[in-house]
């Protein structure tokens, strides 16, 4: 708990009443010696200044007045005539003094209300009545007990007679429910209940042998319950009494090491009690259950008084004889001093930790197991993500049981309705009807125009539709009408009056004259038709190519045409400015001549009509000139030209350029009416990034306009409708134009960043209304690297998460239910290895010492690995180390090759290696069957201080720690002696197994079958190799014991050619029996190889039959006098396996990448990372290193999941189950699964497994 303030006084104290900022009144403690040996006694008032965050400043009294004597007790009541109340002091000289708190604070000289000396001796205790603040009870020496009325302070009356008792009244307390009931405690051990109304004793309790009473306190809610304490150092007890059975206490609280001096029962929560005493400690209890929650920081002298704040029970104060009154709170568990010391100790290395860590002072680090009653809410509600409201209420009033209700909630019902309607319309695919509906419902001209343009883009010929939308429909009819108005198509215009002639002007007159001139020659109509006659036709109109009257230009053109040199003829015609002749020649000369003629024509017409420049741009395919230089008042005509003539590759960019010009015009002229025209250009060019900016600007303006004119709608509803309209336009536009976002893979600088922000906002809105799939759909349109989108996507995934189905497995599943039936019996003929040395004399069968994490064992049977080839059996003892590395020894010399089981089909031979010798100080352990796993701590377990407070209050002992010779402190000594003579029985006793630590053990995963002594037990590890049994009667020397190789993994190749799981063992191809001897002598196994607690325990009995393995011929029994020679083996790897074509390595992703975690493993990442963040945010700073290490190891696991390596499918499924158990706070199940994976799948475990273990422990300890 946090110490907020300190008052540097050895004094009794009282809290100020009322809800104002808390003050404390202190009176110099009678009989106490001050640090400066001053004998001054006074009453002081202190303002704690709790609103200030600076707790280092020393407090100064705000009021002070001298007294004639020291104080034994103080009381402060909220009296009606005084705004700050009245302070009463119980003085050592027997005087009862009353002060006006207001006048004390103001410094008035008449602050003393009265001074009364009715008591003949010292007043030991006093208290105001909680129901009637004018009544004051005082008790003191010689059993004197007075009741005073502030309205008539000079006439108190006494309870009891003077001759009744002569013992001192040490304490008293008014009943909190019945105003006229008072209890007193005396030095003679009498606890007396008084009825003030009748002025008589109601009941007397015998305080367990008339032990002196130091404090009494009534239950704040139950009027018949009270608590008493004794100040005796030999018997520091607190008794809980129920007056309905006053013969004996209901409960006894034991926790203090010396006499209890003060009690304070929290008036707001009857489950909280403070006690302080001569052991310098202040304890917090639950008096209803007798549970001690913990202790507050220990001081250096007696704590003689402790009190809750009457108005705000978050605060309490404790006075001690070390010269301080500490004001503390129950809302935190660490002090600044403790945090600084913890950080200092965190930096200590292994060399000086034990030398310096004991200087750490005792601090309080407990937390209340449940919220105090004043913080409990009878009901509550919270909005949940995904359109849910979670409400909590009491099942029954007065009981702590609650019910939780989750109900759907929508801020605006129209949001869900419009979203659903739009999504259904999209599924139907009728985009045109959507556009028509939205256009008819548009609230502004801009919005209506946008939907019309989008509707035009849906048609089969979007450009033609855009031209029609621009108003250029029926061009042919319009041109014909205009020509008709000019009179060019009417013959009767020749003679139809003056008005027609005047309208045509001079051009019309010339036309009429020429027409009438040629009408007189009817043969002219057949001229051209005559020229098109057949090859043999002749005409009666002869002509001369050269008649002598030609100009040089005519001759040059004629000669060039005769020779087919159209380019030369064109040059002559252009030089002579004969444009009509030039175009005719260019037509005959081909495209090059046509382009040359056109270029010359346009160069000569620079000052001609405007249509000439337009025609030049069209002919020259240079519409950029029109886009950049045409007047913006004619943007519609420019847009029509683009829709008609622009190339498909340039059309979008031309439209964008025209829109950019219009946007620039908007900025220059502030004419927002052009915004609709720019939107048209951007829509026609499919430039989503440009039109979105305009739409968002229109959204803000329309929203603001709607808010100003709205009467019933809320601002949220208006904003959501506008946002919905924007999303609908963008969605339809993307589908119509088949828009492809090419920037989703970028990390930043997105062109559509404004749209992405709206997508995220819209996803949040629809998710709030319960449409999670719709939200996911739009979040998928946002780049993966967008920071806000990543957060939103994680929220959606968590809200949409379902139980991940487990992958189908080909292996036998691991059973987690207890198994109580016996295992199948093994064959009576054990398989024998190909070669073994003679065995030692038989000895009593033994079992390995207790392994708390090993599976349960059977006496005469052993489960079978259905995927392991038949192998010989051997007995291998294990040490008592529960934390040894997996796989037996941690070190194997180079070249060492343990004996291998025979390959399939070979005839096994008799004989086997004997068991390794035991150390001289060991004896066989007794056969024991365990049904529950013990909770033994490991070297990497969570520090003890993380979950429970330190038990010693004096500090760490200075005794030097014992030398640790092993990195695993509980590891047994290694075997160091040679083998005993054959047949030598063990003579000395084995060391005892260390007891398990305190704590509840996890439930057993497999119940051990019945033990049948004296047969050995064997661990039920389905992945371990079958053990070997020792033969009998051999007289040869005993070779060093081999380590038992693990069987092949059930996920690898079939048992005929499996790669060995032991990296030091040869491949299976080299394990076949060979008639030749090996040229290399066998290397002995490493000494002192401690067996792993997770490998199978040995046994002398054969294993049960393997129902999945090929049958093995019965072994032939060889003579026991001599073993056959060893068969040759090779240490080289298998040629077949080494030459086997390697599969392509899976892709490796960088550390920290989580985007490739498969769906079935995603719950592991999400749950564990979320729980790790919860622990990280609440863990004390002294455990920062452990928390960061656990987080680093979990990231290793997440990297494996992201790369889909190391962990097999069944392990992934089990880890998902473990994660769900942690999420449900089912830590026993999580721990059981963790032990199972660590025991049976060690090859998949790594550094990450330690992080999972630490997270389980930290999560359990974190509230």
Swiss-Prot record:
SUPFAM superfamilies: WD40 repeat-like. Residues 830-863, 925-934, 952-977, 1062-1076, 1128-1143 have a biased composition (Low complexity). GO terms for molecular function: structural molecule activity. The keyword Endoplasmic reticulum applies. One of its GO terms (biological process) is protein transport. The keyword Nucleus does not apply. It comes from the Eukaryota. Keywords: Cytoplasmic vesicle, Endoplasmic reticulum, ER-Golgi transport, Membrane, Protein transport, Repeat, Transport, WD repeat. Signal peptide: none annotated. GO terms for cellular component: COPII vesicle coat; endoplasmic reticulum exit site; endoplasmic reticulum membrane. Residues 992-1016, 1038-1061, 1100-1127 have a biased composition (Pro residues). Residues 495-504 have a biased composition (Basic and acidic residues). Residues 487-510, 801-1158 are annotated as: Disordered. Belongs to the WD repeat SEC31 family. Component of the coat protein complex II (COPII) which promotes the formation of transport vesicles from the endoplasmic reticulum (ER). The coat has two main functions, the physical deformation of the endoplasmic reticulum membrane into vesicles and the selection of cargo molecules. The COPII coat is composed of at least 5 proteins: the sec23/24 complex, the sec13/31 complex, and the protein sar1. sec13 and sec31 make a 2:2 tetramer that forms the edge element of the COPII outer coat. The tetramer self-assembles in multiple copies to form the complete polyhedral cage. Interacts (via WD 8) with sec13. This is Protein transport protein sec31. The gene is sec31.
């Amino acid at each position: 708990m946090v110490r907020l303030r300190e008052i540097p006084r050895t004094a009794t104290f009282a809290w100020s009443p009322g809800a104002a900022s808390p003050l404390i009144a202190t009176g110099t403690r009678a009989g106490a010696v001050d640090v400066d040996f001053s004998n001054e006694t006074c009453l002081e008032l202190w303002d704690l200044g709790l609103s200030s965050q600076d707790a280092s400043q020393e407090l100064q009294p705000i009021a002070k007045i001298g007294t004639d004597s020291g104080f034994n007790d103080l009381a402060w009541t909220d009296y009606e005539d005084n705004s700050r109340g009245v302070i009463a002091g119980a003085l050592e000289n027997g005087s009862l003094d009353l002060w006006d708190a207001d006048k004390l604070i103001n410094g008035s000289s008449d602050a003393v209300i009265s001074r009364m000396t009715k008591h003949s001796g010292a007043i030991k205790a006093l208290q105001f009545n909680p129901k009637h603040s004018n009544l004051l009870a005082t008790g003191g020496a010689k059993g004197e007990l007075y009741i005073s009325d502030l309205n008539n302070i000079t006439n108190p009356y006494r309870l009891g007679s003077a001759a009744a008792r002569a013992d001192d009244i040490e304490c008293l307390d008014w009943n909190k429910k019945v105003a006229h009931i008072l209890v007193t405690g005396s030095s003679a051990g009498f606890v007396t209940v008084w009825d003030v109304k009748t002025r008589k004793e109601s009941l007397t309790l015998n305080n367990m042998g008339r032990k002196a009473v130091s404090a009494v306190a009534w239950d704040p809610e139950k009027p018949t319950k009270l608590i008493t304490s004794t100040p005796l150092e030999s018997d520091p007890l607190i008794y809980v009494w129920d007056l309905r059975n006053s013969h004996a206490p209901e409960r006894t609280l034991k926790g203090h090491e010396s006499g209890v001096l003060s009690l304070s029962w929290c008036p707001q929560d009857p489950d909280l009690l403070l006690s302080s005493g001569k052991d310098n400690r202040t304890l917090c209890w639950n008096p209803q259950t007798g549970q001690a929650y913990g202790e507050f920081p220990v001081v250096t002298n007696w704590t003689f008084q402790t009190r809750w704040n009457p108005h705000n029970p978050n605060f309490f104060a404790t006075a001690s004889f070390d010269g301080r009154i500490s004001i503390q709170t129950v809302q935190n568990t660490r002090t600044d001093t403790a945090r600084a010391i913890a950080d200092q100790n965190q930096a200590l290395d292994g060399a000086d930790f034990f030398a310096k860590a004991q200087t750490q002072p005792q601090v309080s680090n407990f937390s209340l197991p449940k919220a105090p009653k004043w913080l409990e809410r009878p009901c509550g509600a919270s909005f949940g993500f995904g359109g849910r409201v979670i409400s909590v209420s009491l099942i029954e009033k007065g009981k702590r049981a609650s019910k939780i209700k989750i109900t759907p909630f929508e801020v605006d019902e129209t949001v869900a309705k419009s979203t659903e309607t739009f999504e259904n319309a999209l599924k139907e695919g009728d985009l045109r009807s959507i556009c028509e509906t939205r256009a008819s419902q548009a609230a502004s001209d801009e919005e209506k125009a946008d939907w019309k343009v989008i509707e035009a883009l849906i048609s089969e010929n979007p450009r033609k539709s855009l031209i029609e939308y621009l108003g250029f429909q029926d061009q042919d009819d319009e041109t014909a009408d205009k020509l008709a108005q000019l009179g060019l198509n009417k013959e009767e215009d020749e003679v139809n009056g003056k008005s027609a002639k005047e309208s045509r002007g001079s051009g019309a007159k010339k036309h009429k004259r020429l027409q009438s001139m040629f009408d007189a020659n009817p043969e002219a109509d057949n001229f051209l038709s005559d020229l098109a006659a057949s090859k043999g036709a002749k005409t009666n109109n002869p002509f001369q190519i050269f008649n002598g009257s030609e100009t040089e230009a005519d001759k040059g053109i004629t000669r060039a045409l005769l020779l087919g040199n159209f380019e030369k003829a064109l040059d002559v015609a252009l030089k002579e400015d004969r444009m009509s002749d030039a175009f005719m020649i260019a037509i005959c000369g081909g495209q090059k001549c046509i382009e040359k003629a056109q270029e010359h024509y346009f160069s000569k017409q620079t000052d001609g009509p405007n249509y000439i420049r337009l025609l030049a741009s069209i002919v020259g395919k240079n519409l950029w000139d029109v886009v950049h230089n045409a007047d913006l008042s004619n943007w519609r005509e420019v847009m029509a030209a683009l829709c008609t003539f622009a190339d498909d590759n340039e059309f979008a960019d031309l439209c964008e350029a025209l829109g950019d010009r219009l946007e620039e015009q908007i900025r220059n002229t502030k004419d927002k009416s052009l915004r609709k025209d720019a939107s048209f250009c951007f829509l026609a060019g499919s430039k989503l990034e440009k039109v979105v900016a305009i739409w968002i600007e229109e959204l803000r303006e329309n929203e603001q306009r709607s808010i100003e004119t709205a009467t019933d709608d809320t601002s949220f509803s208006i904003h959501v409708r506008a946002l919905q309209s924007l999303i609908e336009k963008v969605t339809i536009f993307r589908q119509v134009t088949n828009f492809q976002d090419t920037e989703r893979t970028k990390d930043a600088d997105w062109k559509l960043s404004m749209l992405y922000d709206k997508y995220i906002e819209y996803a949040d809105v629809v998710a709030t209304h319960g449409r999670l799939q719709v939200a996911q759909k739009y979040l998928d349109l946002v780049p993966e690297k967008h920071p806000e989108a990543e957060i939103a996507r994680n929220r959606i995934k968590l809200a949409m998460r379902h139980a991940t189905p487990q992958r189908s497995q080909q292996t036998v599943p691991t059973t987690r239910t207890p198994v109580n039936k016996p295992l199948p019996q093994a064959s009576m003929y054990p398989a024998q290895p190909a070669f073994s040395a003679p065995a030692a004399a038989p000895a009593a069968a033994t079992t390995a010492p207790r392994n708390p994490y090993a599976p349960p064992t059977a006496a005469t049977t052993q489960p079978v690995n259905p995927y392991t080839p038949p192998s010989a059996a051997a007995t291998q003892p294990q040490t008592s180390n529960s934390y040894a590395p997996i796989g037996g020894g941690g070190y194997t010399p180079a070249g060492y090759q343990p004996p291998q089981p025979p390959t399939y089909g070979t005839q096994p031979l008799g004989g086997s290696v004997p068991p390794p010798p035991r150390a001289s100080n060991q004896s066989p352990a007794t056969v024991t069957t365990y049904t529950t796993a013990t909770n033994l701590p490991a070297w990497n377990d969570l520090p003890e201080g993380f979950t429970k407070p330190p038990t010693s209050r004096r500090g760490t002992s200075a005794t030097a720690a014992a030398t640790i010779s092993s990195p695993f402190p509980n590891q047994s000594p290694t075997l160091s002696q040679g083998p005993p003579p054959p047949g030598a029985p063990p003579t000395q006793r084995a060391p005892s197994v260390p007891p398990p630590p305190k704590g509840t053990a996890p439930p057993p995963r497999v119940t051990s079958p019945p033990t049948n002594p004296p047969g050995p037990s064997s661990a039920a590890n389905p992945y371990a190799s079958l053990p070997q049994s020792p033969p009998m009667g051999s007289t040869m020397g005993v070779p060093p014991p081999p380590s038992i190789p693990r069987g092949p993994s059930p996920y690898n190749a079939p048992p005929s050619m499996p790669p060995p799981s032991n990296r030091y063992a040869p491949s299976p191809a080299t394990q076949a029996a060979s008639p030749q001897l090996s040229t290399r002598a066998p290397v002995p196994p490493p000494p002192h190889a401690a067996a792993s607690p997770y490998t199978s325990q040995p046994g002398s009995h054969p294993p049960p039959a393997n129902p999945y393995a090929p049958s093995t011929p019965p072994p032939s029994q060889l003579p026991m006098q001599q073993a056959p020679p060893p068969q040759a083996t090779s240490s080289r790897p298998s040629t077949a396996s080494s030459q086997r074509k390697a599969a392509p390595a899976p892709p490796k992703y960088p550390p920290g990448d989580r985007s490739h975690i498969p769906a079935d493993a995603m719950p592991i990442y999400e749950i564990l990372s979320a729980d790790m963040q919860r622990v990280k945010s609440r863990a004390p700073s002294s455990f920062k290193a452990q928390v960061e290490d656990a987080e680093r190891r979990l990231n290793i696991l997440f990297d494996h999941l992201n790369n889909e390596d190391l962990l097999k499918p069944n392990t992934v499924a089990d880890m998902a189950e473990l994660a769900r158990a942690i999420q449900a706070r089912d830590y026993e199940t999580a721990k059981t699964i963790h032990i199972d994976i660590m025991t049976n799948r060690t090859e998949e475990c790594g550094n990450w497994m330690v992080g999972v273990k630490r997270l389980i422990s930290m999560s359990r300890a974190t509230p």
